Amino acid sequence: MGLKTTISPDSSFDKIINTKTSPPLHINSPMLESLALSKLFKEENAKVWMKVDALQPSGSFKIRGVGLLCNQLLKEKKSKNEEAHFICSSGGNAGKSVAYAGRKLNVKTTIVLPNTIPEATIEKIKDEGANVIVHGTIWDEANTFALELAEKEGCTDCYIHPFDHPLLWEGHSTMIDEIYQDVQNGVCEKPDVILFSVGGGGMMIGILQGLDRYGWNDIPIVTVETVGSHSFWKSFQEKQLTKLDVSEVTSVIKTLSTRSVCSEAWEISKRFNIKPILVTDRDAVDACLKFVDDERILVEPSCGATLSVLYSKKLSTLLDINSKNILTIVCGGNGTSILQLNDLLQTLPK
């Protein structure tokens, strides 16, 4: 898996979030009912709830894990009286979150992106003060370059993988901490099913770890990928961790397009009732446009992939729907605009 960031044994999420000098960089995102989506499930008498991580300060859920990891890396560097330099490869959203963390923590940051990332996304990352390097056509190639750069710069201990690190997963699991508290406080009911998108698997690991923490392993999970970014779906079909050929990575949704989920994602998934589903790029883009009309929240197609399962009512064919409380993770994303979505929709086959 390449270089790993070394974290001292005494590091823990509780210590970090309770330290005045290292506050978390994410917010508690709102849990909202979507009346528009609930209306689609009127016959089933079901409500659709949204965990809206699109409202995170970096634009996506990624800041949960990235903020935790960056805070800890900086703490480690300060203890050695050394200067930190965060280096991260990304399909866009992890890079934006690392750049945001670097700006807030006053740390030099370099983000390596593949050449398929929109210029608008690159500019947003630069606006956070990060140095941006464009290399390769897919994330895997950008990641190889980032690892080499970290070696060259002598800062391998500040290399940040976008989805494969225990502190990233721990940070992402705070999403479930908040959902559990919302249930305890009567904001919503315990979910009967949870839907979310899968790229490299970091968010999935965090969500499943959080569910495990509260004994919610009984909740069915629906994971969503697009055709052409379907590494977890393929692993599930073949009953082993599988890597896509480069020629199979054809989705235009680059923030989902990794050749394989990380090994921990595959291992932890075995302990849960998971139903992977594939949608088309067009489904995902179309869902983004519907969602911005319905909820006035703009998300990118990696998030729209999951929303499309609700808009198309494919969920009803996946479950024996006693699911009265459907929860979808609105994970967000920075790499789009309404104009881009409309333009992209015109290029995708019907």
Swiss-Prot record:
One of its GO terms (molecular function) is threonine deaminase activity. It is found in: Cytoplasm. Coiled coil: none annotated. It catalyses: L-serine = pyruvate + NH4(+). This is L-serine dehydratase. GO terms for cellular component: cytoplasm. Its cofactor is pyridoxal 5'-phosphate. The modification N6-(pyridoxal phosphate)lysine is found at K62. InterPro entries: Ser/Thr_Dehydratase, Ser/Thr_deHydtase_PyrdxlP-BS, TrpB-like_PALP, TrpB-like_PALP_sf. Keywords: Cytoplasm, Gluconeogenesis, Lyase, Pyridoxal phosphate. SUPFAM superfamilies: Tryptophan synthase beta subunit-like PLP-dependent enzymes. Belongs to the serine/threonine dehydratase family. It is an enzyme of class 4 (lyase). Its main location: cytoplasm. The lineage of its organism: Eukaryota, Amoebozoa, Evosea, Eumycetozoa, Dictyostelia. Its EC number is 4.3.1.17. GO terms for biological process: gluconeogenesis; L-serine catabolic process. Pathway: Carbohydrate biosynthesis; gluconeogenesis.
